[in-house]
């Protein structure tokens, strides 16, 4: 009787230990799987941060076309891709309609659907590729009858037509650049734009490229747009400054660039132009840099 009980106890203990080991192995396998996924994403040697890597500008590419090329993009060493605006354009069929949006929301446009953008972001994650979306926030389409309903009120617009004197900073930030200029100083406008960024983030977007950034004022110009839309979003930001935020005033231009760099990185267009010129002329100038030599930290520049 005692031996029978002992054998039974031994069998029960063996079964228990086997189950315990199996459970442990399952736990280990489950814990290893995410590491393997991360390892697979890092097989291409891509940068963890957008600022540190190369961005492929997929200008006017459809979302599904980008998704189909992700492996090739990763193998080519691009750590991020940049799409054209996800906002709904005032028309279709030509790239520039996307830069005349009807509002601040993701909708169906020439690039694809909201679901297709989300699918692109999810697939890009598996390769370790970040997704940057171009955002137009300086203006909307000229036909106000079709723009976002809650922005139709005149108080949300600067209503300053006429040409722009680019040595006049106020005109740069308040006058139309062919489309109606949004009142970036208005707190409601700022929140509408920020909510759009959070919508993009919810779809898996990692970064924002700001179109016409130099046409949007700074805190020193009584405008809290930039701190409002960038803080707390968890997104990387860079913008379009082009040559200078103001012409014919180097001291003011450098001060403004320093202020922009508190909130966003920006393109060093002068540097890129100098590089192109060096290739064309087969000559390298003694100083090929631009913004970096004017006091802007190199980790805030995009080339």
Say what each PLM segment does.
Residues 54-110, 130, 184:
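N-terminal carbohydrate-binding/catalytic regions of secreted carbohydrate-active enzymes
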Residues 41-52, 68-71, 85, 92-99, ...:
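Active-site-proximal helices and loops of the catalytic beta/alpha 8
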Residues 76-86, 116-142, 146-163:
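Glycine-rich, aromatic-flanked loop segments that form ligand/cofactor-binding clefts
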Residues 40, 49-53, 89-122, 150-183:
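Aromatic- and acidic-residue-enriched carbohydrate-binding clefts of CAZyme catalytic domains
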Residues 52-61, 99-112, 175-190, 206-219, ...:
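The substrate-binding groove and active-site-proximal loops of carbohydrate-active enzymes
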Residues 12-20:
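Sec-dependent signal peptide hydrophobic core
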Residues 1-9:
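N-terminal secretory signal peptides that target proteins for export/translocation
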Residues 23-42:
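Sec-dependent signal peptide cleavage junction
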């Amino acid at each position: 009787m005692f031996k029978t009980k002992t054998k039974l106890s031994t069998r029960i203990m063996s079964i228990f230990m086997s189950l315990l080991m199996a459970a442990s192995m399952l736990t280990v396998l489950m814990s290893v799987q995410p590491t393997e996924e991360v390892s697979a994403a890092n097989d291409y040697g891509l940068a963890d941060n957008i600022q540190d890597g190369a961005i492929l500008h997929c200008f006017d590419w459809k979302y599904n076309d980008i998704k189909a090329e992700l492996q090739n993009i990763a193998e080519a060493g691009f750590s991020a891709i940049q799409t054209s605006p996800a906002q709904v354009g005032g028309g279709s069929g030509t790239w520039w309609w996307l830069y005349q949006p009807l509002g601040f929301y993701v909708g169906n446009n020439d690039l694809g659907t909201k679901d297709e953008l989300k699918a692109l972001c999810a697939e890009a994650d598996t390769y370790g590729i970040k997704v940057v979306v171009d955002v137009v926030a300086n203006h909307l389409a000229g036909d106000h009858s079709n723009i976002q309903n809650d922005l139709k009120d005149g108080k949300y617009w600067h209503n300053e037509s006429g040409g722009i004197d680019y040595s006049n900073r106020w005109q740069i930030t308040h006058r139309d650049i062919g489309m109606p200029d949004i009142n970036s100083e208005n707190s409601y406008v700022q929140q509408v734009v920020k909510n759009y960024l959070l919508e993009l983030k919810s779809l898996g977007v990692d970064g924002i490229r700001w179109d016409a950034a130099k046409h949007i004022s700074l805190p020193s110009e009584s405008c809290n747009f930039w701190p409002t839309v960038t803080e707390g979003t968890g997104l990387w930001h860079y913008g379009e400054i082009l040559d200078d935020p103001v012409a014919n005033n180097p001291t003011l231009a450098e001060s403004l660039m320093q202020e922009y760099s508190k909130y966003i990185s920006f393109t060093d267009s002068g540097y890129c132009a100098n590089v192109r010129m060096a290739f064309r002329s087969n000559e390298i100038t003694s100083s090929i840099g631009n913004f970096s030599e004017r006091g802007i930290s190199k980790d805030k520049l995009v080339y």
